[in-house]
A protein has these predicted regions:
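Helix N-cap/beta->alpha junction signal
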Residues: 5, 79-80
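Conserved active-site segments centered on acidic
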Residues: 1-71, 136-139
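Phosphate-binding/catalytic loops
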Residues: 74, 80-139
Length: 139
């Protein structure tokens, strides 16, 4: 929860604010693994957001919990591995709340993981496209 998911969290918050819909959404991100719990957003991800005028100050990684499934209407995964981990946390998806971000676009699949690729621009493009499409669906 230090690269893609916080990028998606803060991009979505930015899009929602620009649409004048902030009072209609509660947006957060959480980790599906434990490695980075408590750590801030990875500096290159933070810089990529800042390039677009988006701050993620004070964000630290937190662990996803079963309560997240009860609290949120939608749980959006960045890749298939996240989907599997999320299903484990929430005990399946009986309410059909879980989906991949890119499945809301014309290019379904995984969001590029910059932790491995080093390509934060490709991740930015995926996240922006996915969040824009998701917001359009939810309007």
């Amino acid at each position: 929860n230090i690269c893609r998911s916080p990028m998606a969290e803060f991009v979505m918050k930015d899009l929602v604010a620009k649409a004048g819909l902030s009072d209609k959404f509660e947006i957060a991100s959480a980790a599906t693994s434990t490695e980075e719990i408590g750590n801030p957003v990875y500096p290159p991800a933070r810089r990529k957001l800042a390039e677009h005028g988006i701050s993620c100050e004070d964000k630290t990684a937190r662990q996803m919990t079963r309560r997240d499934y009860e609290t949120y209407d939608y749980l959006i995964a960045m890749d298939h591995n996240n989907l599997r981990n999320m299903a484990r946390f929430v005990g399946g998806d009986p309410e059909h709340k879980v989906s991949l971000l890119m499945d809301h676009t014309r290019r379904p699949g995984d969001v590029a993981d910059p932790w491995y690729t080093g390509d934060f621009e490709a991740t930015w493009q995926d996240v922006l496209e996915g969040c824009t499409a998701l917001l359009e669906e939810l309007r």
